[in-house]
């Protein structure tokens, strides 16, 4: 063989042997990401920073497609193999995605990093049966109290807030005929309501303890609230009038600032008192997570894990807050000056300590919860004793359990 030709072959072989992890041996050198449209450009910019900081993975082709959290989860459940390598999803889809084998569980090392970096509730939202399956991105979906500080002198108790609103002729808004907001009372007293699903999303079992002393205490608190002259059923500050205080979320922070002006203030949800016992209001919390699809190529998996770690890091979570307003789950990012100055996010972060990550619930549950709340608002239980309220809750509980299995 010609010596020059041999030299070319050998040099080519040597070059191939030192190629970066995306080498031609990989089955696929494209990494596909699904993110909400609002963060597509941001994510593309961060990937460029990732490649610059991680030259070993710069040779992969990174493709970012705009797919919302709900659609991303549904698409993965439909066809895992055709799905994105990394995708955003809401925590209520975790169990289904795990059952469908659509998520790569974190290694012990990665689990340690995720747990160390992020707040306890977001880590819990990414965990199933003691296994961490995703990288938390946010702790920013839930509800808390917006109030007019010229009206409400102390937002720590529901009784005090109502008294201040009544005295000022102002309204207190909370949507107690919503199964989402209603849990603020029931979970506060220790009542439980949750469901298990299979990979197809079918509800297989239910854990409901509303028919209990805890449930009766929660229902009595709702009845007392509805009796207040300040009470208004609602959760959208844009649709509210003459507001002294409202239970709402970060999505309405702009409208709240416009409404309250210099008197704009926020706080965690208050306590309420039933029969001499104080309960801290609870409720549902929501978290955005970043999942990795199982990979057959270990080099590509390493790249995906490095990218997930980068996109969920302190620096990127702060940048994402500044670009899109997403509230960080990263504990250090939560202490960032700009994040700390956001009083709505600060109030929500405090409230999420008392909230429960929302799982999946049957559509019929939401309808049933609305009916219960409507009966409270309508005064149907105003004269009911504890035994009668327990019967109401037993019927509610039996109906909810019947939605599973």
Show where each model-derived region lies.
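Extracytoplasmic/periplasmic solute-binding protein
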Residues: 133-137, 143, 160-207
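Hinge/lid segment of periplasmic solute-binding proteins
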Residues: 91-143, 156-162, 266-268
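Conserved C-terminal helix/tail region of periplasmic/extracytoplasmic solute-binding proteins
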Residues: 337, 350-405
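A structural signal for short loop-to-beta-strand junctions that line the ligand-binding cleft
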Residues: 77-78, 82-85, 112-147, 171-174, ...
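Conserved N-terminal structural module of periplasmic/extracytoplasmic solute-binding proteins
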Residues: 4-13, 17-93, 398-405
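Glycine-centered hinge/linker elements that transmit conformational signals in sensory
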Residues: 200-233
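Short helix-initiation/N-cap motifs at beta->coil->alpha
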Residues: 65-75, 229-240
């Amino acid at each position: 063989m010609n010596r020059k030709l041999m030299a070319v072959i050998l040099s080519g072989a040597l070059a191939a042997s030192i190629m970066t992890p995306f080498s031609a041996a990989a089955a696929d050198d494209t990494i596909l990401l699904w993110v909400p449209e609002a963060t597509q450009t941001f994510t593309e910019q961060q990937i460029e920073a990732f490649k610059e900081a991680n030259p070993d993975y710069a040779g992969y082709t990174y493709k970012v497609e705009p797919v919302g959290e709900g659609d991303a989860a549904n698409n993965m459940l439909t066809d895992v193999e055709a799905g994105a390598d990394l995708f955003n999803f809401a925590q209520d889809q975790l169990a289904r995605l795990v059952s469908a084998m659509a998520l790569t569980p974190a290694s012990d090392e990665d689990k340690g990093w995720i747990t160390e970096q992020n707040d306890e509730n977001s880590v819990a939202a990414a965990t199933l049966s003691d296994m961490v399956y995703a990288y938390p991105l946010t702790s920013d979906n839930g509800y808390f109290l917006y109030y007019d500080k010229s009206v409400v002198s102390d937002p720590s108790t529901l009784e005090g807030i109502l008294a201040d609103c009544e005295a000022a002729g102002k309204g207190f808004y909370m949507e107690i005929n919503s199964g989402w907001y209603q849990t603020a009372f029931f979970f506060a007293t220790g009542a439980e309501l949750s469901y298990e699903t299979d990979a197809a999303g079918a509800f297989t079992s239910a854990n409901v303890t509303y028919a209990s002393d805890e449930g009766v205490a929660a229902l009595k608190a709702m009845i007392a609230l509805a009796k207040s002259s300040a009470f208004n059923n609602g959760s959208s500050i844009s649709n509210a009038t003459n507001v002294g205080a409202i239970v709402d979320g970060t999505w309405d922070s702009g409208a709240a600032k416009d409404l309250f002006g210099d008197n704009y203030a926020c706080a965690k949800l208050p306590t309420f008192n039933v029969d001499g016992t104080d309960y801290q209001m609870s409720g549902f919390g929501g978290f955005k997570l970043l999942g990795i699809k199982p990979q057959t190529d270990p080099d590509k998996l390493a790249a995906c894990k490095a990218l997930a770690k980068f996109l969920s890091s302190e620096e990127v979570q702060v940048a994402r807050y500044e670009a899109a307003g997403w509230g960080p789950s990263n504990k250090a990012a939560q202490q960032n000056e700009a994040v700390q100055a956001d009083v709505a996010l600060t109030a929500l972060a405090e409230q999420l300590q008392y909230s429960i990550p929302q799982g999946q619930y049957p559509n019929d549950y939401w309808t049933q919860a609305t009916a219960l709340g409507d009966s409270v608002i309508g005064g149907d239980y105003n004269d009911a004793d504890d035994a009668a309220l327990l019967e109401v809750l037993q019927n509610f509980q039996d109906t909810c359990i019947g939605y599973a299995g």
